[in-house]
Amino acid sequence: YKVLISGDYKRVEDKTCKGYENKKCDIFITEATFGLPIFSHPFDKDEIKKLLESIIKNNQKPHLIGVYALGKCQRILSLLRDAGYDETIYLHGALMKITDYYVSEGVRIGKVKNTSDLNMSELKNQIILCPPSALHDKWSRKFKNPIKGIVSGWMNIRQRIKQKNIQLPLIISDHADWNDILLTTKENNPEKVLVTHGREEA
C-alpha cells in the first residue's frame, strides 16, 4: 500500500535540479498552490524573452528582478544562459551563498557579481536579481530609474502585479499549474487524492 506525498513539484524541465517522475500510488497527497483553472503557466523561454526584450527596449534602465534565493534564482540564471544571454548578471548579497553552492555542484550559471562590490547608480541595462522583499526597501533606491519585475506564478494575477507595483511580471513557477496537477493525478492513478495548499472550492 503506497502513499505518495508530493511536496512542491513542477513537470517542466529545470537544469538546476532533478526532473519529475511519475510514481504509481494508492493515495496521492498533492500540493495545489495553483490549483485553479485560471493558472496555466506560459513557457519559461517566452517569459525570459520578455525580460530580454525589455532590456533592449529600456536600454538605459537597470532591471531589478525579484527571485527567491533557493531554486528560483539559479533557475533564472540557467534560463538566461540557455537563451544566449552571456553578460554579467548581478546578484543581491542574499543570493550569493546558495548560488555559490549550486556552482560547486556543477550548475552552469555563467558570470555573476555581488552588487555590494559595485557603484549601483552606474548600472544601466543590466539584470540584477534580488529577493522580492528587496524591490521596495532601501537597497533598491540605490538604482537609477529601474524596471522592477518579479518571477512568480502569482504574476498571473493582475491585482498582485498592481499591489506590488511591478512593471515586468514574469510567470515562471516552481509549482505545477492546474493542467499539470490534473495530469499528474491521472498518471499516478491513485484510489484516493488529498490536496494541500489549494482552494477548497477547486
Segments the model singles out, each with a brief description of its role:
Residues 1-71, 82:
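His/Asp/Glu-rich metal-coordinating catalytic cores
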Residues 143-174:
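Mobile, glycine- and charge-enriched loop segments
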Residues 14-16, 38-40, 97-105, 123, ...:
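Short, charged, surface-exposed secondary-structure boundary motifs
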Residues 184-195:
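Proline-aspartate-enriched helix->loop->beta-strand connector
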Residues 7-9, 32-34, 70, 94-95, ...:
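Active-site metal-binding loops of divalent metal-dependent hydrolases
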Residues 27, 61-64, 88, 125-128, ...:
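Residue-level preference for the first positions of well-ordered beta-strands
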Residues 48-61, 67-125:
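Hard-cation-handling environments
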Residues 1-18, 50, 58, 67, ...:
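Core dinuclear metal-dependent hydrolase active-site scaffold
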